[in-house]
Amino acid sequence: MPITLRIFRFDPEKDKEPHYQTYPLEAEPTDRLLDCLNRIRWEQDPTLSFRMSCGHGICGSDGMRINGICGLACQKLVKDFLEGEEILLEPLPVFKVIKDLIVDLGLFLEKYNSIKPYLIAKTVPPEEERRQRPEEQRLFEAAIRCILCACCTASCPVNQSRETANYVGPAALVRAFRYLFDSRDEATAERISLLDHKDGAWGCQTLWKCTKVCPKQIPVTKEIGQIKRRIHEMKRK
């Protein structure tokens, strides 16, 4: 099956401006776009740069914009496109481009770390483990699936605006939700203080872009809404 990949290229060490380069190739319908990128790098152009690791939608490394929609190259199959179609591959928006399809996730991870993405338990640990009932775990089960691919943050219009560039972003809020609703966590008030401001949970404008692109089908917008409700509940106490 003939396809053509039109790929964003930019090497800051030698390019003044970004440009696009096309690569025609034959591919099987069941090939992933990541397979096609690897073949281009192996057979046509070894200078092409992109991130990858597991290749199975677990690591989140190969996030990029595919025909204008953010997603994982390892989850998109050739048969998802029309025969002979030119497929446009670009780096995730919002982030600074390091080279070609590779972006700098430093600020993304900095914002993620700002919400304290770990269990905070202040009581003395039990002899065995901090137990939890299955129904308690189900409250945040979906949030655990987040692989930090940054597709949600890159798709968020709030993150894309310079006026709201300090917004912590949907990925960080999903992780905040995960611990805010964890029955074992003992830092609810502390977490609320980190989220109760215009660049925290209230920065979300409920546009659902993040939910639509999440490769792990996490109900991102819904979970952010639950954070807002929890903030209101805490203030009423």
Question: Where are the predicted features?
Answer:
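Short strand-turn-strand beta-turns centered on an Asx-Gly dipeptide
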Residues: 26, 66-68
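Short, structured protein-protein interaction patches enriched in aromatics and acidic/basic residues
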Residues: 54-63
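Extracellular interaction modules
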Residues: 81-86
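Active-site phosphate-binding and catalytic loops of NTP-dependent enzymes
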Residues: 45-51
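Short, contiguous acidic and Ser/Thr-rich linear segments
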Residues: 20-32
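Ferredoxin-type iron-sulfur electron-transfer modules in oxidoreductases and energy-metabolism complexes
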Residues: 30-43, 90-237
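Eukaryote-biased recognition of intrinsically disordered, low-complexity regulatory segments
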Residues: 2-22
